[in-house]
Regions:
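Rossmann-like NAD(P)-binding element
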Residues: 35-38, 42, 56-118, 125
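NAD(P)+-binding Rossmann beta1-loop-alpha1 motif at the extreme N-terminus of oxidoreductases
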Residues: 1-56, 111
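Long, compositionally biased
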Residues: 242-247
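Helix N-cap / loop-to-helix initiation motif
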Residues: 3, 36, 64, 164, ...
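Internal alpha-helical scaffold of NAD(P)-dependent oxidoreductase catalytic cores
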Residues: 26-28, 136, 157-188, 203-231
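Rossmann-fold dinucleotide-binding core
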Residues: 117-187, 194-197
Length: 247
């Protein structure tokens, strides 16, 4: 089995920047790219000084300063798609629009070396659709991260019928090296979401019904679920926090 040494991240938004930081801290050489220079600047700043950035990790005793400096040096923030595409593993982190993701996968298939694994951080679009946009469906996989990427141990590794065992195993090993607890799950093209989001959104629909029926307010639902199930936040607070990167 080949070893992943370099990782490209396509998209420097809330998730892409955090994923790049996590990978760099795990020892990977990372190239993170975005078409928007402002997104790259924000991601670079967040990785260095943000709430879950390297400076904060040093202050909390999670890293020493030399480890933080080394991680910072392992990230290249670039506006070059082609540069990021020359990696052993490329993780797509563009907005949740299927047509955009398919376009990215077509471009990656053209630009990336033959051995490269192509992964998507989609929250729920079928991985089979993205695999079908390439000539290497056996090397396509989902790697669904949770926000904030650096903190959360969650990792859904989503495999299709065509994903090879080698691809799955390499990405699982990468996730473990990043300190995650990866679980390989099956792609289900007939449903949106894999495991965590299918269950979460079913719960969120019921929470919304409770509010719509006047049983409780949004805030009351949040408080009750925290107190009853010892969740860190309630279902409505989760939506807001995850979308903002918990800033």
């Amino acid at each position: 089995m080949s070893e992943i040494k370099t990782v490209g991240v396509i998209g420097a938004g809330v998730m892409g920047g955090g994923i790049a930081q996590s990978l760099a801290q795990a020892g990977y050489e990372v190239t993170c790219t975005d078409i928007a220079s402002e997104a790259l600047d924000t991601a670079r700043q967040d990785a260095a000084e943000g709430r879950f950035g390297l400076a904060g990790a040093v202050a909390r005793g999670k890293l020493d300063s030399s480890e933080a400096d080394a991680a910072r040096a392992r990230i290249t923030w670039s506006d070059s798609f082609e540069e990021a595409a020359q990696s052993d593993l490329i993780i797509e982190c563009v907005p949740e629009k299927l047509d955009v993701k398919l376009s990215v996968f077509r471009s990656l298939d053209e630009a990336a070396p033959e051995h490269s694994i192509l992964a998507s951080n989609t929250s729920g679009f079928p991985i089979a659709a993205m695999a079908g946009a390439t000539r290497r469906p056996d090397q396509v996989v989902g790697w669904h991260w949770a926000s904030p990427a650096f903190v959360m141990k969650f990792a859904e590794i989503v495999v299709t019928e065509g994903t090879s065992d080698s691809t799955r195993d390499q990405v699982m090993a990468c996730a473990k090296k990043c300190g995650k607890n990866p679980v390989a799950v099956r792609d289900n093209p007939l449903e949106w979401g894999f495991v965590a989001n299918r269950i979460y959104f079913a719960m969120l629909r019921e929470a919304s019904r409770v509010v719509d029926e006047g049983v409780a307010t949004h805030a009351e639902v949040n408080d009750l679920m925290v107190d009853c199930f010892r969740w860190p936040v309630g279902p409505f607070a989760m939506v807001k926090g995850a979308g903002s990167g918990w800033k």
